[in-house]
Curated annotation (Swiss-Prot):
This is Bifunctional purine biosynthesis protein PurH. Residues 1-145 form the MGS-like domain. One of its GO terms (cellular component) is cytosol. It catalyses: (6R)-10-formyltetrahydrofolate + 5-amino-1-(5-phospho-beta-D-ribosyl)imidazole-4-carboxamide = 5-formamido-1-(5-phospho-D-ribosyl)imidazole-4-carboxamide + (6S)-5,6,7,8-tetrahydrofolate; IMP + H2O = 5-formamido-1-(5-phospho-D-ribosyl)imidazole-4-carboxamide. Keywords: Hydrolase, Multifunctional enzyme, Purine biosynthesis, Transferase. The IMP cyclohydrolase activity resides in the N-terminal region. GO terms for biological process: 'de novo' IMP biosynthetic process. The lineage of its organism: Bacteria, Pseudomonadati, Pseudomonadota, Betaproteobacteria, Burkholderiales. InterPro entries: AICAR_Tfase_dup_dom_sf, Cytidine_deaminase-like, MGS-like_dom, MGS-like_dom_sf, PurH-like. CDD domains: IMPCH. Pathway: Purine metabolism; IMP biosynthesis via de novo pathway; 5-formamido-1-(5-phospho-D-ribosyl)imidazole-4-carboxamide from 5-amino-1-(5-phospho-D-ribosyl)imidazole-4-carboxamide (10-formyl THF route): step 1/1; Purine metabolism; IMP biosynthesis via de novo pathway; IMP from 5-formamido-1-(5-phospho-D-ribosyl)imidazole-4-carboxamide: step 1/1. It comes from Cupriavidus necator (strain ATCC 17699 / DSM 428 / KCTC 22496 / NCIMB 10442 / H16 / Stanier 337). Belongs to the PurH family.
Amino acid sequence: MIKQALLSVSDKTGIVDFARELNALGVTLLSTGGTAKLLADSGLPVTEVADYTGFPEMLDGRVKTLHPKVHGGILARRDLPEHMAALAEHDIPTIDLLVVNLYPFQQTVAKDDCTLPDAIENIDIGGPTMLRSAAKNHRDVTVIVDPADYAVVLDEMRANANSVGYDTNFRLATKVFAHTAQYDGAITNYLTSLGADKSHQGRSAYPQTLNLAFDKVQEMRYGENPHQSAAFYRDLRAVDGALANYVQLQGKELSYNNIADADAAWECVKSFDAASGAACVIIKHANPCGVALGANALEAYDKAFKTDSTSAFGGIIAFNVELDETAAQAVARQFVEVLIAPSFSAGARAVFAAKQNVRLLEIPLGQGINQYDFKRVGGGLLVQSPDARNVQPSELRVVTRRHPNPKEMDDLMFAWRVAKFVKSNAIVFCGGGMTLGVGAGQMSRVDSARIASIKAQNAGLTLAGSAVASDAFFPFRDGLDVVVDAGATCVIQPGGSMRDDEVIAAADERGIAMVVTGTRHFRH
């Protein structure tokens, strides 16, 4: 039964209302510093911890709750007579509810003007100590670290004569240990990222010790293959626009492969500015098999589907604009696993209501960039910054005698944007705001070029006058000759080969335009 609570919070969201409800339930309130002042100013009866312990705060507030009267009241097991006798001997009442959140260390070190002393002063000591004490003794103590749990605890107290059930206490305790682990991990990440001069501005993006924090969203029936187990975890630092922010509107549970492919689709489609028109991306096995722009979602979808209607079967489809009813009716004619959009109109929702197996994911558009990309290797983790560089037309360098005309330049920029999301080696034919042929994942660039042209031929699409993007340089002229023979009149590629001069000479010989970006987009 909760008779006494200690409240000490940095995030004061909802704390006054929560304390008022506790007071109404007859709970004695203890508090510290700014929290105590806020509660007192709000007319609530509250005792300062310094008055409660008989020992003043000291060292500029560094020591205020590190006292036996606080920790004894939290840690004592109510089922052990010797514990309760010790409390009685030293006149220590039990503390049955602890509400604490920590100094804002992460927010402090995120500021550009942060200094090491600023960071150090925002390392909480008393807060984590109390939290861990209460979480350890969760059989007898309710502990809250998240304001979102205030209502749950109050509801249980009202229903159970001021008591909170063990299952809730256990859940809240595990939440505390996860929170303090993340907090300590953030401190370690920051301090081990500092260089010899210990300056905030000179810190490394890659700390000596890297701690990562993820919350489990769901366990899955299986992983990439049926004999593999799997789960999906959300990064606690998920940025705006990330796939992990999805809301599933309908459909079966997402599988491992669904989520992997959905991420590829969403990252590709949101790279196109919705203000410039609708974009549609169709993904199969993490590769785009159709990408297109249109005046609306329907036009973008129709063009993307034409690129490779065979591979689109059972694919993942993403839009960067709301999916309306007209486009939904067209999409519903094919077998699709997952549909992603910033929003779905009521009409579109109605279309798919009859196809409950189709998973609809709504994700707010956003251009947040993850801090890291990861690749697991045996015994280790490769960590890099994301491939977030988007080359602007002004950065391109024309290396051939012939310059691309405005239409070709538009097609080249579109092709280059798509190639970034195709597995290497990648060759992408484009024209008129749509992909015409995609060659992905081949060990030689010339084979990717051949496959891309064959794909276009199989789809009945002409490559005459098309633009081609290559995610990395042409090591020889053979790949260039394949795309020109297929009908391409302009090429965009990074450049940087030892044989650049030979490849450029071949482009001049064939009469095409070539621009180089100086940026490579390998994707493995």
